[in-house]
Amino acid sequence: MGEPWAARGTEGAPARMPVVFTALWAAVVVLELTYVMVLGPGPPPLEPLARALQLALAAYQLLNLLGNMGLFLRSDPSIRGVMLAGRGLGQGWAYCYQCQSQVPPRSGHCSACRVCILRRDHHCRLLGRCVGFHNYRPFLCLLLHAAGVLLHISVLLSPALSALLQAHSALYTVALLLLPWLMLLTGKVSLAQFALAFVVDTCVAGALLCGAGLLFHGMLLLRGQTTWEWARGQHSYDLGMSHNLQAALGPRWALVWFWPFLASPLPGDGITFQTPTDVGLVTS
């Protein structure tokens, strides 16, 4: 018999390493951006009104990014504190031997979090937390605004990178963009030049990854699926596009993308889920 989930510790140090690396990378990006803006070529030349709009956009993006990240990390998607005992067990319920508890449909046990997650989608290793029923909305919005912030940073750093690349050959440009570490180790670039190329490379790659993740999870959102259900071709909870959006994002699903603190309560509880039959989408 394993220990009940309430008595077990949280994920160990190895599982936290991606979170540490994510935080360190974010710090490097901020330092490089500050260095280029203050001591380097500075931001692209703009008119005062355009500059004010750019600053407003940056502040808006940053607020959305940090707001959704905070909501994601503060939301507990697990069965901790959820009254499961005494509920009428129906189809889809199962017994988790690790948690020593009955768990509802669409739940899954996470070996990193060491607890079952309500409507578990996957474990986000970069943030060290599972994506489930209660934090799916901020996770999706986080992908959107992370892609926007990373692209904005790439644009702000592009004049400095362009000035560096114009002074060298095409082969040097390709090598610096694709193999900045090798260029640094062989002494072809300075540490400052390497940092600039590395940050721009990772920001562009990060934006592409966030964009791809947003497209993938947007598809799942419209289909009413989790990643686990998608991998197994299950469509048991597909209520149609409109119902699926409201089930995951609340009644204000079209507005939650623009402001992280907008009230849009979820219609469910993460324990019971409607099926197409319940909403009259299946006829005999």
From Swiss-Prot:
Residue spans crossing the bilayer: 19-39, 53-73, 138-158, 167-187, 196-216
Cell compartments where the protein resides: Membrane
Recorded coiled-coil stretches: none
Gene Ontology CC entries for this record: endoplasmic reticulum; Golgi apparatus; membrane
Reactions the enzyme catalyzes: L-cysteinyl-[protein] + hexadecanoyl-CoA = S-hexadecanoyl-L-cysteinyl-[protein] + CoA
Domain DHHC intervals: 94-144
Family: Belongs to the DHHC palmitoyltransferase family.
General function of this protein: Probable palmitoyltransferase that could catalyze the addition of palmitate onto various protein substrates.
Domain notes for this protein: The DHHC domain is required for palmitoyltransferase activity.
Pfam family, one: DHHC
Protein name per Swiss-Prot or TrEMBL: Probable palmitoyltransferase ZDHHC24
Membrane topology recorded in Swiss-Prot or TrEMBL: Multi-pass membrane protein
EC number in record: 2.3.1.225
Catalytic residues (positions): 124
GO MF annotation, one: protein-cysteine S-palmitoyltransferase activity
Keyword Transmembrane: yes
All ranges on the Cytoplasmic side of the membrane: 1-18, 74-137, 188-195
Keyword Transmembrane helix: yes
Residues in the Extracellular compartment per record: 40-52, 159-166, 217-284
